[in-house]
């Protein structure tokens, strides 16, 4: 065994922990199909949200960790449940009243309200795929509609008929009495309307491969369960898919946890082996409510990428997948700065085991680019933007170039992008909410002390020395809690409750510019 393998197998980073579970489930052997199958799922009822991206990003982290532990080939599929009937019209799409006419129709049988693709489902699938492609995921896209209609699931659907009673015995105890009377694992597709029907099944014939139901007129309608003429209810569908595709690893949100036992048991009933599974916590919006594609109450993928690099979004996905996290615009600056810190630590670290534990290893699948920001963080750029209110990033670069003459937009493209992102974020989220504190007489004494200190120091004074001098002024002012002191300074000088380390900020902004800012409040 190589030292690299030993470090990876011992790692406590969660992608390696998951990868070890998969390897153990296989007893180190290559599956009969010749590869290990990772599956992610997507419900295209509404526009893909950031949670959809998150599942795929996390899945690839586990896939790449597995490839570090084993030379067994792997494959990732993204499965779209686009044959589901439309149950609710999303609020964040154009022409919702048009879509409302197609309730219970398969998503791939509804006209595209965006006017770009052959159906609503195809449009939603395209939105997901375009981003997965943009991020560089290597995957195969599976459409539920195509799988059912092409006969990929036919063998399993016939087996569901053969095991009908056993599956019903498993499912019925999970329902209320009213639902028990009408439930069947099969949902016929109406030959006349094309709708996905949730109707009682009057008769099922395993030999003929058909089910029979009553239409609204009381007529008995017999349809094959194969060839896309029926679809399974979502719980049996989950387990059937695991068995049909021989899935080895699946992730799902906490909303699936209560049904995970059913998925696994149905997979076993159909002769399959349930995959290793990871249940991740759901993202919450600013109000602590679950984010939803149909509500559109979340940051979209495009929203995040308007204000920050994609790596920061991947870091948010990596961190603590089994813990619920609030997902709103305020988390963006923090994740950008944490990514910068992790990136710098990774390249300073020589211990491979510690590198394996660093999130950026998994975000970049072991090929971590080296970025240089010269100690300039996203938060620092936001505060610089706050005081100089630039029309474009060239204004920020004027300060950056004085702070670090080596830095240029061409040689430091990451920093250049951060400057552009910071201006956008400031204009959209900070500018309108700035509220300045009018300085009291006590504050004016403090500001004068700061001004005197700035007048006495040279432009070459180190940031730490400036920070200590400001700290000493706060101590002298008699604050019981220096947090209150710095909060007052941020409110007076920046119009915000929070702010940067002032020593570093003054070095970036410039001593003379800072003197003008302080003088303006006296």
From Swiss-Prot:
Keyword Nucleotide-binding: yes
A Pfam family hit: tRNA-synt_1f
Enzyme Commission number(s): 6.1.1.6
Keywords, ordered alphabetically: Aminoacyl-tRNA synthetase, ATP-binding, Cytoplasm, Ligase, Nucleotide-binding, Protein biosynthesis
Motif interval(s): 'KMSKS' region: 290-294
Primary residence: cytoplasm
Entries under PROSITE patterns matching the protein: AA_TRNA_LIGASE_I
Statement: the UniProt record of this protein carries the keyword NADP: no
Sequence motif: 'HIGH' region, positions: 44-52
GO terms classed as biological process: lysyl-tRNA aminoacylation
Positions with a binding annotation for ATP: 293
Entry's Gene Ontology molecular function annotations: ATP binding; lysine-tRNA ligase activity; tRNA binding
One cellular-component annotation, GO: cytoplasm
Catalytic activity: tRNA(Lys) + L-lysine + ATP = L-lysyl-tRNA(Lys) + AMP + diphosphate
Entry-linked InterPro entries: aa-tRNA-synth_I_codon-bd_sub2, aa-tRNA-synth_I_CS, aa_tRNA-synth_I_cd-bd_sf, Lys-tRNA-ligase, Rossmann-like_a/b/a_fold
Compartments, as annotated in UniProt: Cytoplasm
PANTHER family from the UniProt entry: LYSINE--TRNA LIGASE (PTHR37940:SF1)
Family assignment from sequence similarity: Belongs to the class-I aminoacyl-tRNA synthetase family.
Name of protein: Lysine--tRNA ligase
Taxonomic path: Bacteria, Pseudomonadati, Pseudomonadota, Alphaproteobacteria, Rickettsiales
């Amino acid at each position: 065994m190589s030292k690299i393998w030993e470090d990876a197998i011992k790692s406590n980073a969660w992608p390696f922990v998951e990868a070890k579970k998969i390897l153990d489930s296989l007893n180190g052997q290559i599956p009969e199909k010749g590869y290990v199958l990772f599956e992610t799922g997507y419900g295209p009822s509404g526009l893909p949200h950031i949670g959809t991206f998150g599942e795929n990003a996390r899945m690839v982290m586990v896939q790449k960790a597995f490839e570090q532990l084993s030379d067994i080939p792997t494959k990732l599929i993204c499965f779209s449940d686009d044959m589901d009937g439309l149950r609710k019209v999303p609020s964040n799409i154009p022409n919702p009243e048009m879509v409302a006419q197609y309730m219970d129709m398969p998503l791939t049988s509804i006209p595209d309200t965006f006017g770009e693709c052959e159906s609503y489902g195809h449009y939603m699938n395209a939105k997901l795929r375009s981003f997965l492609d943009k991020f560089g995921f290597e995957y195969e896209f599976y459409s539920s509609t195509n799988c059912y209609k092409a006969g990929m699931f036919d063998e399993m659907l016939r087996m569901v008929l053969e095991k009908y009673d056993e599956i019903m015995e498993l499912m019925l105890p999970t329902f209320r009495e009213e639902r028990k009377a009408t439930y069947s694992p099969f949902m016929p597709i109406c030959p006349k309307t094309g709708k996905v029907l949730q109707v009682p099944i009057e008769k099922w014939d395993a030999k003929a491969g058909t089910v029979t139901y009553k239409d609204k007129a009381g007529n008995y309608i017999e349809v094959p369960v194969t060839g896309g003429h029926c679809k399974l209810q979502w719980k049996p569908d989950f387990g059937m898919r695991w068995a049909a595709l021989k899935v080895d690893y699946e992730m799902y949100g906490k909303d699936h946890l209560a049904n995970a036992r059913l998925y696994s048991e149905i997979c076993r009933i159909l002769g399959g082996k349930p995959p290793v599974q990871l249940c991740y916590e759901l993202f919450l919006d600013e109000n602590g409510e679950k984010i939803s594609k149909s509500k559109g109450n979340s940051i979209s993928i495009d929203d995040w990428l308007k204000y920050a690099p994609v790596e920061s979004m991947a870091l948010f996905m990596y961190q603590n997948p089994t813990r619920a996290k609030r997902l709103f615009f305020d988390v963006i600056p923090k994740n950008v700065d944490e990514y910068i810190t992790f990136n710098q630590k990774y390249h300073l670290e020589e211990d491979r085991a510690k590198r394996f534990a660093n999130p950026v290893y998994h975000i970049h699948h072991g090929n971590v680019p080296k970025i240089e920001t010269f100690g300039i963080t996203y938060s620092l750029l936001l505060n610089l933007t706050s005081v100089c209110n630039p029309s474009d990033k060239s204004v920020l670069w004027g300060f950056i170039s004085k702070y670090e003459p080596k830095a240029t937009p061409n040689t430091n493209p990451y920093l250049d992008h951060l400057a552009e992102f910071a201006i956008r974020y400031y204009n959209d989220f900070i500018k309108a909410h700035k509220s300045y504190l009018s300085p009291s007489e006590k504050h004016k004494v403090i500001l004068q002390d700061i001004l005197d200190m700035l007048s006495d120091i040279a432009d070459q004074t180190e940031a730490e020395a400036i920070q200590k001098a400001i700290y000493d002024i706060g101590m002298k002012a008699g604050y019981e809690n220096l947090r209150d002191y710095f909060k007052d300074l941020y409110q007076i000088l920046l119009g915000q409750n929070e702010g940067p380390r002032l020593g570093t900020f003054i070095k970036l902004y410039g001593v003379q510019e800072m003197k003008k800012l302080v003088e303006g409040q006296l």
